[in-house]
């Protein structure tokens, strides 16, 4: 036979290169070489910027205290997802553009799109979680503290990752669509399985459409609440401006005393605090020693709201950038299934990759605190690590929520939890009952030893450290805020803190311009010239100024303005240490001081003071009803005499145990 059939071994056994290479079809030449080169350069550039930016953001959020809050936990999760996308997905996509096809095998052709779509889903879900966090903080701030606790934050973040990757497991296993090489796009993507099923539509609805709708609904509600709040503020400002100047309360009078109750201002701020708060403006001491009259302000509220709104706008910008980067590739794949316009596909892929590196740029542009955090990391400035999210070192929940609002950087915040007084060994005990009984501790003007408020630092993260040079003075361990007793001393600055019961918390009950009365609240006399902080000195010399005293929940918080560059070196006010009791007898039998009940108020006084004899400190613990049981177990309560002054709705109890005196306010249940 002249005609012989030749069988080539290559027809039956393909070369080894074909086992690991998906060669594009002949009609795939629509992707020009210049277009692929441009795409490769942009992909590698985005990869470098994304890795550096997201890694820098994670380190900055973990290192810098002032950006550590609940939203930062979700931002860290978002940055980790983008970091994995840039480090694991973009290198292979860049090589795909360089080589013109996929040359990395079937296994990576399945894993890379699995990681790609998983990280995209995690990013959008984290943005949705941050938006919900903003929504709860602004519109339902009463629930914020109960929802965003440490363990719940971890559960939310874990749910984002598990849901995003769990939705793709059937596709990875080939049970519902499959990951494979798309010859039309020359990339690995989601393909139909042998039964013609694909998970693209379901993943698009569950991982993109639903989170976007949730985000849009939350922001619509946020903008509505903010708009209403701005309208109320404008009406309030118009009403305040219409009041004549001679009728507006001033922070000080000619004698230097603050009008009683003239500075109490209620505030229901839209923030992360779960309870209302009240603030008192203390007139700052000018360098000349004269007190400047100031109007009633609430700058703490303005700063907190402004910071919350700034973070909200930043998250909105992140969401809009994600939508802008993700929508083009979705539209192009639906409108151009046959890849008739290759340049549109290349540009849409570049926009998709850009979403992984644009978030750090938004942080730098829109948030001043993030810029400072980046500088701290880049220039290796010292910064301390904080405790885990949602937890502080012994701080109360109110203080923790206070920290989460991200208040101004130029203010130091100190919690005041105890009040001691040098009134002599008070004797006697009594209980006053009435509709709004009040305990007012008074001492005669002859007794010069002042009452004091011990400022207890609940956690190192709650007090801003001053960068000023420290004087050569050894201050006492705790900061001390001395309070001049209420009496005839005209140089004292009398502050009235009217309190009322509101969901088992002390809040303000409005203005009180009258003298102490059973309905006025708890009176505390504070001298503006006797406020002392270690390393700073006395405020009376013009070295610093306490501008605000605020109670949030169970804690009294002092807010201190930024200090001048060179404060004078002053010494700390010293008080004699309490001596041990000389006899086992009760103070009632050895001292002439008396405790009386007058007009619904408990008044502790002394008819014959002895200035020459050192008197022990008398500690008054002013706490909310939830802490009453603790002090009841520690102190000996006085027997409450019956009172005919009114119904027993509210009671003030003064009890003496040794040299300790405890004043407690009890309220009926709601």
Curated annotation (Swiss-Prot):
Record topological domains on the Extracellular side: 1-40, 91-111, 174-202, 335-345
A GO term, aspect molecular function: G protein-coupled receptor activity
Subcellular location: Cell membrane
Bias type Pro residues, positions: 564-584
BP terms from Gene Ontology: axon ensheathment; behavioral response to cocaine; behavioral response to ethanol; behavioral response to nicotine; cortical actin cytoskeleton organization; establishment of glial blood-brain barrier; G protein-coupled receptor signaling pathway; septate junction assembly
Membrane topology note: Multi-pass membrane protein
PROSITE patterns recorded: G_PROTEIN_RECEP_F1_1, G_PROTEIN_RECEP_F1_2
GO CC list: membrane; plasma membrane; pleated septate junction
Keywords attached to this entry: Cell membrane, Disulfide bond, G-protein coupled receptor, Membrane, Receptor, Transducer, Transmembrane, Transmembrane helix
Ranges where the record places region Disordered: 258-302, 461-490, 562-622, 636-670
Primary localization: membrane
Reported consequences of knocking out the gene: Mutant flies display an increased sensitivity to cocaine and nicotine exposure. In contrast, sensitivity to the acute intoxicating effects of ethanol is reduced.
Signal peptide: none
Disulfide bond positions: 109-188
Keyword Transmembrane helix: yes
Biased composition, class Polar residues, residue ranges: 646-660
Compositionally biased intervals (Low complexity): 267-279, 585-598
Tissues in which the UniProt entry reports expression: Isoform A and isoform B are expressed in the head. Isoform B only is expressed in the body. Expressed in embryonic glial cells that are involved in ensheathment and insulation of the nervous system. Both isoforms are expressed in glia that insulate the larval and adult nervous system. Also expressed in the germ cells, the gut, and the heart.
Highest taxon of the lineage: Eukaryota
Family as reported in the entry's similarity comment: Belongs to the G-protein coupled receptor 1 family.
Function, in words: Isoform A and isoform B are required in glia to regulate the acute sensitivity to cocaine and to continuously maintain the proper blood-brain barrier (BBB) function. A moody-mediated signaling pathway functions in glia to regulate nervous system insulation and drug-related behaviors. Galphai and Galphao, and the regulator of G protein signaling, loco, are required in the surface glia to achieve effective insulation.
Record-linked PANTHER family: B2 BRADYKININ RECEPTOR/ANGIOTENSIN II RECEPTOR (PTHR24228), G-PROTEIN COUPLED RECEPTOR MOODY (PTHR24228:SF63)
Record-given protein name: G-protein coupled receptor moody
Taxonomic source organism: Drosophila melanogaster
Gene: moody
């Amino acid at each position: 036979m002249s005609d012989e059939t030749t069988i080539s071994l290559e027809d039956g056994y393909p070369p080894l290169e074909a086992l690991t290479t998906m060669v594009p079809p002949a009609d795939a030449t629509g992707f020009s070489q210049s277009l692929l080169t441009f795409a490769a350069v942009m992909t590698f550039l985005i990869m470098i910027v994304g890795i550096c930016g997201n890694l820098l953001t994670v380190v900055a959020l973990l290192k810098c205290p002032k950006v550590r809050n609940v939203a930062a936990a979700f931002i860290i999760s978002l940055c980790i997802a983008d970091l994995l996308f840039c480090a694991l997905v973009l290198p292979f996509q860049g090589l795909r553009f360089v080589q013109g096809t996929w040359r990395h095998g079937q296994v990576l052709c399945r894993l890379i799109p699995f990681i790609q779509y998983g990280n995209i889903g995690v990013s959008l879900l984290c943005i949705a979680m941050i938006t919900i966090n903003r929504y709860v903080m602004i519109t339902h701030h009463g629930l914020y503290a109960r929802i965003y606790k440490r363990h719940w934050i971890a559960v939310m973040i874990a749910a984002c990752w598990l849901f995003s990757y769990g939705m793709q497991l059937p596709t990875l296993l080939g049970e519902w669509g499959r990951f494979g090489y798309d010859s039309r796009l020359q990339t690995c993507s989601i393909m139909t399985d042998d039964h013609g099923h694909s998970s693209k539509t379901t993943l698009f609805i569950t991982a993109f459409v639903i989170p976007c709708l949730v985000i849009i609904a939350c922001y619509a509600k946020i903008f509505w609440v903010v708009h209403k709040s701005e309208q109320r503020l404008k009406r309030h400002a118009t009403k305040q401006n219409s009041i004549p100047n001679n009728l507006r309360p001033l922070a000080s009078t000619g004698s230097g005393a603050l009008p009683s109750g003239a500075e109490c201002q209620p505030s229901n701020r839209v923030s992360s605090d779960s309870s209302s708060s009240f603030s008192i403006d203390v007139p700052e001491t000018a360098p000349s020693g004269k007190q400047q009259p100031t109007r009633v302000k609430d700058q703490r509220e303005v700063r907190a709201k402004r910071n919350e709104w700034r973070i909200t706008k930043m998250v909105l910008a992140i969401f809009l950038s994600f939508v802008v980067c993700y929508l083009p590739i979705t539209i192009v794949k639906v409108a151009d299934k046959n890849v008739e316009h290759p340049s549109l596909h290349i540009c849409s892929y570049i926009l998709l990759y850009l979403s992984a590196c644009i978030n750090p740029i938004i942080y730098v542009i829109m948030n001043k605190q993030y810029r400072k955090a980046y500088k701290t990391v880049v220039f290796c400035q010292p910064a301390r690590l904080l405790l885990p999210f949602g937890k502080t070192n012994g701080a109360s929940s109110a203080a923790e929520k206070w920290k989460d609002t991200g208040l101004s950087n130029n203010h130091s915040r100190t919690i005041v939890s105890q009040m001691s007084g040098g009134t002599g060994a008070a004797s006697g005990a009594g209980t006053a009952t009435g509709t709004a009984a009040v305990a007012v501790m008074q001492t005669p003007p002859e007794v010069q030893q002042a009452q004091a408020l011990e400022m207890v630092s609940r956690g190192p993260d709650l007090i801003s450290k001053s960068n000023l040079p420290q004087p050569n003075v050894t201050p006492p361990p705790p900061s001390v805020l001395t309070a001049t007793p209420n009496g005839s001393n005209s140089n004292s600055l009398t502050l009235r803190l009217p309190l009322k019961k509101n969901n088992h918390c002390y809040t303000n009950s409005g203005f009180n311009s009258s003298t102490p009365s059973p309905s006025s609240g708890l009176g505390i006399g504070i001298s503006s010239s006797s406020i002392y902080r270690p390393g700073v000195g006395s405020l009376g010399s013009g070295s610093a100024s306490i501008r605000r005293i605020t109670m949030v929940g169970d804690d009294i918080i002092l807010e201190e303005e930024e200090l001048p560059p060179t404060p004078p070196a002053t010494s700390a006010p010293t008080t004699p240490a309490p001596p041990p009791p000389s006899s086992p007898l009760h103070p009632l039998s050895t001292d002439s001081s008396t405790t009386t009940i007058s007009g619904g108020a408990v008044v502790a006084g002394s008819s014959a003071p002895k200035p020459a004899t050192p008197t022990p400190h008398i500690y008054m613990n002013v706490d909310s009803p939830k802490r009453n049981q603790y002090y009841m177990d520690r102190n000996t309560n006085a027997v409450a005499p019956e009172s005919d002054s009114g119904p027993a709705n509210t009671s003030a109890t003064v009890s003496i145990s040794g040299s300790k005196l405890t004043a407690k306010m009890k309220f009926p249940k709601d």
